[in-house]
Amino acid sequence: MQFPAFYVTGTDTGIGKTVASTALLHAVRARGHTAVGMKPVASGCVATPQGWHNEDALALQAASQPQPDYATLNPYALPAALAPELAAADVGVTLSLVPLQQALAQLRAQAEVVVVEGVGGWAAPLSAQLDQADLVRALQLPVVLVVGVRLGCINHARLTAAAIAADGLRCIGWIANEIDPQMERIEDNIRMLGQRLAMPCWGRIPWRPNAQAEGLAQHIRLPE
């Protein structure tokens, strides 16, 4: 695989980063590679006998082969469904890059490909001192942008791509994720996205609210 690890970000929160990330994991596995997910920071967790667990991180774990230890996949699991900076402060946690670098190194030793899912949109901070760009720089990862296809997505996608570039980071691909089944002229919007985003399209995920990640993998177009 050309990119053994990459960071999945989005044009906003709630636009389907986890849907895209789990589909990517299955698509990589369908090519015969081992692949594991990672959710460095997750807010909005539930208490379990094993500790705080997050729904999105569990989805990444389920789509991984081999399945990594949860604490390695999601080093910072924060209870409150708030921005990470607020959720961490609520429980007295200070986010640090070193544990995340160590966790990624462990995951890369376990699998050929690691799909790292970010939080919210690109500019959503991790803490008062850390932006996602700082994390991606520390992990030395390229970026894949998930575009939630709805009214306003062209503006959001262009702004996000420009912000990634301004941060000195490389966006290697984008994925169209259809999240509004009532959107008018969706084909025109996706065509315009393709014309205006400089990186290749890695796929178009159709609106299927109850679809399984393995089935959605067929809509992913991985680079050779």
From Swiss-Prot:
CDD domains in alphabetical order: DTBS (cd03109)
One GO process term, biological-process aspect: biotin biosynthetic process
HAMAP family, sorted: BioD (MF_00336)
Assembly and binders: Homodimer.
Record-stated family: Belongs to the dethiobiotin synthetase family.
Cofactor field: Mg(2+)
GO CC annotations, alphabetized: cytosol
Alphabetic keyword roster: ATP-binding, Biotin biosynthesis, Cytoplasm, Ligase, Magnesium, Metal-binding, Nucleotide-binding
Annotated Gene3D superfamilies: P-loop containing nucleotide triphosphate hydrolases
Residues binding Mg(2+), per UniProt: T18, D56, E117
Positions with a binding annotation for substrate: S43
Entry protein name: ATP-dependent dethiobiotin synthetase BioD
Keyword tRNA-binding recorded: no
Pfam families registered for this protein in UniProt: AAA_26 (PF13500)
Function: Catalyzes a mechanistically unusual reaction, the ATP-dependent insertion of CO2 between the N7 and N8 nitrogen atoms of 7,8-diaminopelargonic acid (DAPA, also called 7,8-diammoniononanoate) to form a ureido ring.
EC number: 6.3.3.3
Subcellular location: Cytoplasm
Membrane-spanning residues: none
Residues noted as binding ATP in the record, renumbered to the chain: G14, I15, G16, K17, T18, V19, D56, E117, G118, V119, G120, N177, E178
Active site: K39
Metabolic or biological pathway: Cofactor biosynthesis; biotin biosynthesis; biotin from 7,8-diaminononanoate: step 1/2
A GO term, aspect molecular function: magnesium ion binding
InterPro entries in the cross-refs: DTB_synth_BioD, P-loop_NTPase
